[in-house]
Amino acid sequence: MKPILGLVILLSGTVAAQAQATRVYSDAGNIVIERGGNSTKLTTSEMDLDPVLSPNGAFAVYTRQGRGRSPRTYEFNQTCPTEPRPDQLRRINVDGSGDQLLLTGRKGEPERQLCDFRSKQFSADGRRLYFLTPAWASSGALHVYDLRAGEEHFLMPAKGLLVLSFCPNKYKDHLVVLSRRNFLLGGSYDWYWLYDPTGKKELGPLGQFNNAEDMIRQARGFWCAEKP
């Protein structure tokens, strides 16, 4: 899932800036919060990765890898492991309290299996959390978790994701999804497509970009530049 890495790094920095210079990160498998130049360890399992800070800066959501301290690399077509333990999606308050389990990884069909919980991104109000999981040979699966209802469901195949939570215009919380499509007479191509926040309505193609960073610059400089 290497195409996602640059996008995750950029978005982590964006969320941190919005939350008054507060940022969360993983260090030696533990979740750490940094505020005002001071760092505090929130977890101590040595198995925790890929945290993302909520829009209001009150809590973080992270992955606890079920394979413990061993190095973890997921490919798109990987079957989600449940031994020795399944991965977990967890939430913890920024003061270290309230560490709780949100989702447990599971095996299943590509659109149903859960693990990794990569490229986590919130909606603007912090209610919905979008993430990617391994699924098919050429694509991951996009899921959404409703933090109020405690419900998760599959949205669509996806190789990359950007939630336009920072948009001040009509595209606020819309989804930019990198999808693989097939040409009519053979072959395939990877383009970005725009969806409504539910992921149920495709609004149209956004085109091809050399990398995720170029796509994000386009989103901030053009798609989300106009005010309501």
Annotate each predicted stretch with a short phrase.
Residues R23, Q65-R85, P134, S179-G187:
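Short, conserved, GDST-rich strand-edge loop motifs in beta-rich repeat architectures
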Residues Y25-S26, F59-T63, L129-L132, L175-S179:
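Residue position within the beta-strands of beta-propeller blades
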Residues Q18, P51-A60, K120-R128, S165-H174, ...:
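Blade-terminus and WD-like Trp-Asp/Gly-His loop motifs, strongest in beta-propeller folds
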Residues E34-M47, R91-D116, Y145-L164, D196-A219:
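Multi-bladed beta-propeller domains
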Residues G37-R72:
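N-terminal, post-signal-peptide region of Sec/Tat-exported proteins
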Residues I4-G13:
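Sec-dependent N-terminal signal peptides
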Residues Q18-T40:
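An edge-strand/N-cap motif at the start of beta-rich repeat modules
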Residues N30-V32, Q88-R90, A141-H143, W191-W193:
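A short loop-to-beta-strand structural motif that recurs across blades of beta-propeller domains
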